[in-house]
Amino acid sequence: LIEATSGNTGIALAMIARLYDIEIELAMPANSTRERVLTMEAFGATVTLTETIESARDYAVEKAASGEFFMLNQFENPDNYLAHYKTTGPEIYRDTKGTITHFVSSMGTTGTIMGASMT
C-alpha cells in the first residue's frame, strides 16, 4: 500500500497494515509533526517526507502507477465523502433535531464537510 497523508489517516492505515501484515509506505509533508512520523514508523510504516502535501500526493500517485503499490487515494476516493453523507450528516441532523445552523470542520480531505453538507 501507499498513501499520501498529513497524519490521522496515515496512522490508522499504519495500524491496519500492521494488523494484516501488509507493507505500507506513507508520503507526507516535511512539516508534519515528529510525533506523527514516529507513530506511523512504530506501526511499521515506511515514511517518506516531501516538500508539501501536494508533492506527497504526486509521489504516491507515481509509485502506484508503477504497479508495485496500491493507493487508497483518500483525497479523491468517493467513499470518503459518501461515508459522511450516509452517516455523519444524518447523525448531526438527528442529534440537533434539524436545528443546526452552522457546521465547522477541518479541511483535510474535505470529505467530512462535503458529505455532511449534502445531507
Where in the sequence are the language-model features?
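A short, small-residue-rich loop immediately preceding and capping a beta-strand
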Residues: L1-P29, T99-T112
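Small/polar-residue-rich loop-to-helix segments that shape phosphate-bearing ligand pockets
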Residues: I22-H102, S106
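Conserved PLP phosphate-binding loop immediately N-terminal to the Schiff-base lysine helix
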Residues: L82, G111-M114
